[in-house]
Amino acid sequence: HKPYGYLSQFIYELKRKKKLLGELYNFPKGTMAIGRLDEDSEGLLLLTTDGMMSEVVRSKKVDKEYYVQVDGIINQEAIEQLQKGVEIGFNGTKYSTKRCKAFLIHEIPAFGARGKKIRDERHGPTSWASITVNEGKFRQVRKMTAAVGFPTLRLVRVRIGNVRLNDLQAGEVKEVENFQIEI
């Protein structure tokens, strides 16, 4: 479970001090992340020492589900826009996202407090939605919620294919034998 504030990599060559995955656990030599979660995102991050497995998962259209806390109370109209696809900026051009699954989450997920406070409650209400995509453009889910008027405050990946985060706590690592992902 990648915590907030960590890069989803093991080596960082710029001068600024960043928190890296290798600080969480004594991973085997050659461990790499399958895909990425940005520094501000949390949740399920698959790691492997098998470069072929990494490539298979990244090259296939595997569903990735995110629980997203947004600014304001997201409405059904915004959910339907997300489902149909929205226009976002990508590599300096406009990009229309593919259709996705999206729905409002009525109960607040039990992820525990984030290391850094999201914001003061005096700034108004927030709500949670589930968004499942099978593509992965740079900061795509954040851009999608902003495009429908509900900026992302917290983003937690809860599923990749058939692999779920379940009750794994931030910073915890679970080793999986004979790993296979359903596509």
Predicted feature locations:
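RNA pseudouridine synthases
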Residues: H1-I183
